[in-house]
A protein has these predicted regions:
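Conserved glycine-rich Rossmann-like NAD(P)H-binding loop of the short-chain dehydrogenase/reductase
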Residues: 31-46
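N-terminal Rossmann NAD(P)H-binding glycine-rich loop of SDR-like oxidoreductase domains
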Residues: 18-27
């Protein structure tokens, strides 16, 4: 990275930091001068300053993560995600419900002016066609992903669990884009 370190002195939390887009995001943030707090269910990645192992399908694990993470976070990069080949309830838990649980729990630990980036996909482009299920998903706890998937017949057929997780994430992100703006 040849530019000035744009993130120098910033603390960025990156979920999914051990592989794929999360790994590359952590590397880029580190190269840009950030202190990276990596979160993943698997292994530690060398380009993070601190690593936290957490399973984003489990509410108690997420709560424990929130408890141990430091205050003073300048950004959250919600990158962790499962593909449509994973069980539908796990896809919903990681890609949507766990992400929301973690993000909302971390709000008191964010610095004023902090940024939140939620990685979605073109798979979520049809979110407006899924509004009834999206509205039904609003208060669902991460530990209730299996029940929600069954009640709303969200399965892996045609990648539906993945598509829905991204549709609902886009809607939630748009819904909350102004929610915390008074913090800068």
């Amino acid at each position: 990275w040849e530019r000035a370190p744009l993130l120098k002195g910033k603390t960025i939390l990156v979920t999914g930091s051990a592989s794929g887009i999360g790994l590359e995001t952590a590397r880029l943030c580190t190269a840009m001068g950030a202190k990276v707090l990596g979160v993943d269910v698997t292994k530690r990645f060398d380009h993070v300053e601190e690593f936290y192992r957490a399973d984003l399908t489990d509410g108690a694990t997420i709560d424990a993560l929130i408890d141990v993470l430091p205050k003073g976070i300048d950004g959250i990069a919600n990158i962790a995600g499962l593909p449509p080949t994973a069980p539908a309830d796990k896809v919903l838990a990681v890609n949507l419900f766990g992400l929301k649980h973690l993000t909302l729990g971390l709000l008191p630990k964010l610095n004023d002016g902090a940024s939140i980036v939620n990685l979605a996909s073109l798979a979520g482009f049809g979110w407006s066609d899924a509004i009834p299920a999206i509205l039904a998903s609003e208060g669902v706890h991460v530990d209730d992903a299996t029940r929600f998937a069954a009640e709303h017949q969200i399965t892996n057929a045609g990648g539906r669990s993945y598509f829905f997780s991204k549709e609902a994430l886009i809607a939630w992100t748009m819904q909350n884009r102004w929610t915390w703006r008074d913090r800068g």
